[in-house]
């Protein structure tokens, strides 16, 4: 089987890094097309031996990208096309059908109740999504929570498959030596209690809540923010105004999978933390929380379907927090008062092993490879 994965961009992000990890475990010959931004993850995929094509799309309405994408699919002789993220799902499904491929699947990585990929959901976005969804044979939801959102949108339940995001458990196994070295490298005091936040620095992630929570905690508490994004300068200013700028560290974008770049990777940074806090109120999965649990960290979160969809005993060190900075400050103080626990991965982390996710996806591939009636692009346009 030859498969083509089409994704909107390949900068450092959850969906992008998940694609790279997945391709390491899929027993399928895969190429990747990125519509825009062939960033750090594109370099990582190339280092893994994956062929990456940059389509050079200039914007959402660059219709010249469609015939170029059709040509790439035809020339590649692909049996299956798998799309990721909104723009790639719109253009990728249509291009695959025009190129004669019928085995089409899309993964819905980031559908929230009120936003998708950090943007507000409107009637136009939903209508276009549903029209293009009909061109494929299946839509993969990364959690039962997202599957429920898709059903409420109007995607027929038989077309939805749940394939959770996966993690490389061995990659996140706690290493006390790496913890010590990373904390030294970051210049952290030996007695620092380190609160971690991981993710794109965007307004929707609400990392400002953690900055304000830090201001309510004793002076030996530090905040380590792992990720890059447009809100970094805003967060720096917020930290300065709150009087905690000297206790907030920004690492910038860090790879989840080793890519040879200098500086500590995500696992080492998780080892350096004492607790992970995730104040984002609307998540589709909560990959950062699961990775933190795999590193043996206690977690305080506002939203995490990956944990909420499992029995409570699966992640005893994970607690949901309702409220803003005051609530997080109390929850983090309670986490510290509980004292350190063995840094072992709970059942929830094992549930999300990447091998299991890859096996589930292969089952989806096998199902959609079986011919079944589905509408043509012309039929969808007419409807």
Regions found by a protein language model. Name each.
Residues 5-64, 149, 229-230:
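N-terminal strand-loop element at the rim of the active site
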Residues 145, 166:
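Carbohydrate-associated surface elements
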Residues 63-67, 102-105, 112-135, 148:
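Nucleotide-sugar donor phosphate/pyrophosphate-binding loop at the beta->alpha transition
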Residues 34, 298-302:
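Short hydrophobic beta-strand element within catalytic cores of glycosyltransferases
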Residues 312-326, 334-339:
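Conserved acidic donor-binding segment of nucleotide-sugar-dependent glycosyltransferases
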């Amino acid at each position: 089987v030859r498969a083509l994965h089409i994704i909107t961009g390949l900068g450092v992000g959850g969906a992008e890094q998940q694609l790279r990890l997945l391709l390491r475990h899929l027993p399928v010959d895969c190429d990747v097309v990125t519509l825009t931004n062939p960033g750090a993850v594109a370099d990582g995929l190339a280092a893994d031996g994956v062929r990456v094509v940059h389509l050079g799309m200039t914007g959402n309405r660059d219709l010249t990208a469609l015939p170029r994408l059709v040509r790439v699919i035809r020339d590649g002789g692909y049996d299956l096309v798998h799309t990721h993220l909104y723009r790639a799902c719109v253009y990728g499904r249509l291009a695959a059908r025009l190129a004669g491929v019928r085995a089409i699947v899309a993964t819905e990585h980031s559908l929230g109740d009120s936003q998708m990929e950090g943007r507000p959901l409107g009637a136009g976005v939903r209508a276009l999504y549903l029209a293009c969804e009909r061109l494929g044979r299946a839509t993969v939801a990364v959690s039962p929570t997202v599957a429920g959102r898709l059903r409420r949108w109007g995607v027929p339940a038989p077309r939805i498959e749940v394939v959770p995001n996966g993690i490389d458990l061995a990659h996140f196994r706690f290493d006390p030596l790496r913890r010590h070295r990373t904390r030294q490298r970051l210049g952290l005091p030996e007695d620092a209690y380190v609160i971690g936040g991981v993710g794109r620095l965007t307004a929707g992630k609400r990392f400002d809540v953690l900055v304000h929570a830090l201001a309510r905690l004793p002076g030996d508490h530090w905040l380590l923010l792992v990720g890059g994004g447009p809100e970094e300068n805003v967060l720096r200013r917020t930290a300065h105004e709150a009087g905690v700028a000297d206790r907030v560290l920004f690492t910038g974008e860090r790879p989840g999978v080793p890519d040879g770049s200098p500086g500590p990777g995500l696992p080492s940074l998780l080892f350096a933390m004492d607790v992970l806090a995730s104040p984002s109120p609307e998540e589709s999965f909560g990959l950062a929380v699961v990775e933190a649990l795999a590193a043996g960290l206690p977690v305080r979160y506002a939203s995490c379907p990956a944990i909420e969809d499992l029995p409570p005993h699966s992640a005893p060190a994970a607690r949901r927090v309702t409220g803003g900075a005051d609530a997080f400050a109390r929850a983090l103080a309670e986490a510290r008062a509980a004292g350190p626990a063995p840094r072992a991965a709970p059942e929830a982390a094992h549930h999300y092993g990447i091998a299991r996710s890859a096996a589930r996806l292969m089952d989806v591939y096998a199902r959609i490879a079986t011919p079944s009636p589905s509408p043509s692009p012309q039929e969808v346009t007419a409807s």
